[in-house]
Amino acid sequence: MAKHAFLSASASHRWINCPPSAKLCEGIKDESSHYAQEGTDCHELCAYLVEMALGRDVEDPTENLTYYSGEMQNCAEEYRDYVLEQFERSKKFCSDPMVFIEQRLDFSRWVENGFGTGDCVIIADEVLHIIDYKHGLGAVSYTHLTL
């Protein structure tokens, strides 16, 4: 299982509103669910499709994805297309934009031992484009703290 930061970006909605909750939750087993695993599988598929489209040597994870489906494939392809669109757009003002997929992001300068994972980070000169893939049910607001 992936390592999680004590003050993780994904749990910031909780610890910003209730700072003691970070300490109280320490040591409590982080139990996954079907929905969380499906999201993890789709993130893995998304990363693969983007990396392939960028010409990188990556292994197809499809046969190892527990929740793989045609719908998941369609969602991942839409994500890939969006990332590639943003990458192409960034080439209009930067000759060599960089794309990082599933990149560890360290914000420990502001939060002790703080880090998270960026689904897609595009660096194009002075522009930083962060794309956070969301999968599953529920609405995501632009006010969501991880965005």
Regions from the PLM with identified roles:
Residues Y133-Y142:
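Short beta-strand-loop-alpha-helix junction that forms the active-site gateway
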